[in-house]
Each structure stands twice: as C-alpha cells, then as structure tokens.
C-alpha cells in the first residue's frame, strides 16, 4: 500500500481482493508452537485452539476452539464468546484475528502441517 493516509489504508483493506484478505487473518503463535515450527505467525483456521489476548475483560484470556473464520470481515468466531440480543438469544461474537494467539493447530489439514514443517526446514 502506497499511501500513508489512514483513511486510504482502511479503504484499501476493505476493498482488498480475497487472496490478500486471507493473509490478514494471521495470528501470532504461542511460544511453544513458535519454537516447534520456527515461524512467528500463521493463518487462523477452523478447529485451531486460540487464546484471546485483547478485548473485553470477560473474554480476555479465554482459550477455546475456532468455530468459523470470516475472510470478508477479517474476524473469527470462537467457542463460548457470545453476545445477547435484545430478545435474549445468544449469538457468536466475532473477534479480530490480530487479537488472538494460536495455542494448538488443527492437525487434520495435512497440507497445512506439511507447509509448516517445510518452513521450519527452510530456516535450518
């Protein structure tokens, strides 16, 4: 992004193509995962276990599984993080991916795990 103006940055993020927005869904790894895989961050995927490090006091520190990932908005739905509607029903409250730390990967995606191990081998 070429501009330094905040509103131009926001517009570029909002109008970015999906392959660029996908990269904006990355979160830092926990210290243990960082040492194991040799990378600092990775994309958040459904089934990962994450810890919320920023946000409201009642959700901060929560560690739970990712239920859904919204590429368009750059937010993640985390198990147990809900808000109440006016009629009393609880709905999922999406959290921005930058406010999360990945503590455990969903190991069902073999391509993703191979990709992480290749990155580790490349650093060695």
Where on the chain are the PLM-derived regions?
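Short, charged beta-turn/beta-strand-edge "cap" motif at the junction between a beta-strand
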Residues: 53-60, 82-84
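Structured, basic alpha/beta domains of bacterial-type, RNA-associated proteins
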Residues: 63-119
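Intrinsically disordered, Lys/Arg-rich N-terminal extensions and targeting peptides
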Residues: 1-46, 119-124
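Residue-level "contact hotspot" at macromolecular interaction interfaces
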Residues: 40-43, 57, 94
């Amino acid at each position: 992004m070429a501009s330094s103006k905040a509103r131009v940055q926001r517009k570029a993020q909002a109008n970015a193509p999906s392959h660029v927005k996908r990269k904006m869904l990355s979160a830092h790894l926990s210290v243990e995962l960082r040492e194991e895989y040799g990378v600092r961050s990775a994309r958040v995927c459904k089934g990962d276990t994450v810890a919320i490090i920023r946000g409201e006091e009642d959700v901060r520190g929560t560690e739970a599984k990712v239920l859904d990932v919204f590429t368009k908005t750059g937010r993640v739905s985390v198990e147990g993080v809900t808000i109440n509607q006016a009629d009393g029903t609880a709905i999922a409250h999406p959290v921005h991916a930058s406010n999360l730390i990945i503590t455990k990967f969903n190991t069902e995606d073999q391509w993703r795990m191979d990709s992480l191990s290749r990155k580790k081998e490349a650093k060695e």
